[in-house]
C-alpha cells in the first residue's frame, strides 16, 4: 500500500462526511519543502476557497494525530480544477473520449509521455490515441494523468 493509499483511507471518511468527494491526493517529497496535496470535489456546484479551508482544518487535525508522514510538509487542499488529475479507474472512465495527458514510469511502445484522446478504459489499462496511433497504457505504469481542458 502506497503512502497516498494510506492517506486516502485515513481521510476519505471525514471528507465525505463533510459533504465532499475525496478526488485524490499526492505527496511530493522535497525535504523540508515537501507537499501533501489533497483534491476535493463537490457535485455540480464545485469547491470554494472556504470549502478548502474547512477541509484543510479537519485534515490537518487528523494528520497531526495519526502522523502518517514523519517529516515536515505543507498541506494543500484544492479542487481538481479543469485539468483535473486522474487517480482511480472510475475517474478515467468518466473522462473516456476526452483528451488526456499521461506520463508513465516505464516506456510504453517507446515513449513515456502521451497527449491524445483516451478512447477506451478497461479494468487494467487505458487506450490513448496519439497522432493516429493507439497506445494501451496499463494503470500500473501511469505516474500521472490529467484531463486536458477544452476551451
UniProtKB/Swiss-Prot annotation:
Highest taxon of the lineage: Bacteria
GO cellular component terms, semicolon-separated: cytosol
Gene Ontology terms: biological process: ribosomal small subunit assembly; translation
Protein name in UniProt: Ribosome maturation factor RimP
Position of the signal peptide: none
NCBIfam families associated with the record: PRK00092.1-1
Family annotation (InterPro entries): Ribosome_maturation_RimP, RimP_C, RimP_C_sf, RimP_N, RimP_N_sf
Keywords: Cytoplasm, Ribosome biogenesis
Designated gene of the protein: rimP
Subcellular location(s) per record: Cytoplasm
Family: Belongs to the RimP family.
Source species taxonomy: Bacteria, Pseudomonadati, Pseudomonadota, Gammaproteobacteria, Thiotrichales
Amino acid at each position: 500500500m502506497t503512502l497516498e493509499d494510506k492517506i486516502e483511507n485515513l481521510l476519505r471518511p471525514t471528507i465525505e462526511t463533510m459533504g465532499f468527494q475525496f478526488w485524490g491526493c499526492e505527496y511530493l517529497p522535497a525535504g523540508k519543502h515537501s507537499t501533501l496535496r489533497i483534491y476535493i470535489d463537490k457535485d455540480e456546484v464545485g469547491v470554494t476557497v472556504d470549502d478548502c479551508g474547512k477541509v484543510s482544518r479537519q485534515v490537518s487535525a487528523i494528520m497531526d494525530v495519526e502522523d502518517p508522514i514523519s517529516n515536515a510538509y505543507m498541506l494543500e487542499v484544492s479542487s481538481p480544477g479543469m485539468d483535473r488529475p486522474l487517480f482511480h479507474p472510475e475517474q478515467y472512465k468518466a473522462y473516456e473520449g476526452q483528451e488526456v495527458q499521461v506520463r508513465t514510469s516505464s516506456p510504453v511502445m517507446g515513449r513515456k509521455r502521451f497527449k491524445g484522446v483516451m478512447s477506451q478504459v478497461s479494468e487494467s489499462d487505458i487506450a490513448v490515441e496519439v497522432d493516429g496511433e493507439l497506445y494501451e497504457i496499463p494503470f500500473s505504469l501511469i505516474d500521472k494523468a490529467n484531463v486536458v481542458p477544452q476551451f
